[in-house]
A protein has these predicted regions:
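Short, intrinsically disordered/low-complexity patches at protein termini
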Residues: 79-80, 89-92, 199-200
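A short helix-loop-beta-strand connector motif used in the catalytic cores of GNAT acetyltransferases and
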Residues: 86-101, 110
Length: 219
């Protein structure tokens, strides 16, 4: 355990073909992360702060946003949101999660990131479970696609993921459309007893790099 606690901070800055980032994640002291789209310069992904509380409470109490996501259960009070933000602000190395908020024109309108990070027991590969939620008014505008691409690409290229997994329920037609048609990845049927997910997309680092959605593919 001591070796894990003494891991050096994960610090990097960079610019790719479609986003820039400043990453400083540390077990000790405050962490920071900001990813800015070059396609939409007013679109940013960053770690949450206390100032996001009202926006997140609004997001998690709007049925249109959470109807297909059981992981949002119980996030319906100011106290629950405050606890969630504090949880998301804590960064442990090795990484266990990197949750972000989506900011457009200075307004917090969504959340996402890698909600769980861990090593697969069979081969030791580092896996990140990715997700994204946007307010209804900001959907079908390209923001969801661009935000998810930034989360995935940053996860592989900066955070060191070997695979990124994304899951949803069968009824979530909009998200299935994003994954199947827009991104073009193949899903597998699953039975997720915890969150009820029925489809999963398992994306390897190599497959992502070769896709037209990655920084490499857009270069």
């Amino acid at each position: 355990m001591a070796a894990e606690a003494d891991q050096p901070a994960l610090t990097a800055t960079g610019s790719t073909s479609f986003y820039t980032h400043s990453t400083a994640l540390s077990t000790h002291g405050a962490s920071s992360l900001c990813i800015t789209s070059l396609t939409y310069p007013h679109l940013h992904l960053r770690l949450p702060s206390a100032e996001d509380a009202a926006a997140l409470l609004r997001l998690f109490t709007d049925y249109r946003n959470i109807q297909y996501d059981k992981s949002c259960t119980g996030l319906d009070s100011a106290d629950a949101i405050d606890h969630l933000i504090k949880q998301w602000q804590v960064v442990n190395l090795p990484l266990q999660r990197v949750n972000i908020v989506v900011v457009i024109d200075g307004k917090t309108v969504g959340t996402g990131g890698l909600g769980w990070i861990g090593r697969r027991k069979t081969d030791g590969k580092l896996i990140g479970d990715a997700g994204l939620m946007l307010e209804t008014d900001f959907r079908n505008s390209g923001y969801g696609y661009e935000s998810l691409c930034m989360v995935i690409d940053h996860g592989f290229c900066v955070l060191g993921m070997d695979e990124v997994h994304i899951a949803c329920v069968d009824a979530n037609a909009a998200f299935k459309g994003l994954m199947n048609r827009k991104l073009g990845f193949q899903a597998e049927r699953i039975e997720d007893k915890m969150f009820g997910n029925e489809w999963i997309w398992r994306i390897t680092k190599e497959v992502w790099a070769e896709s037209p959605h990655s920084a490499q593919g857009r270069a």
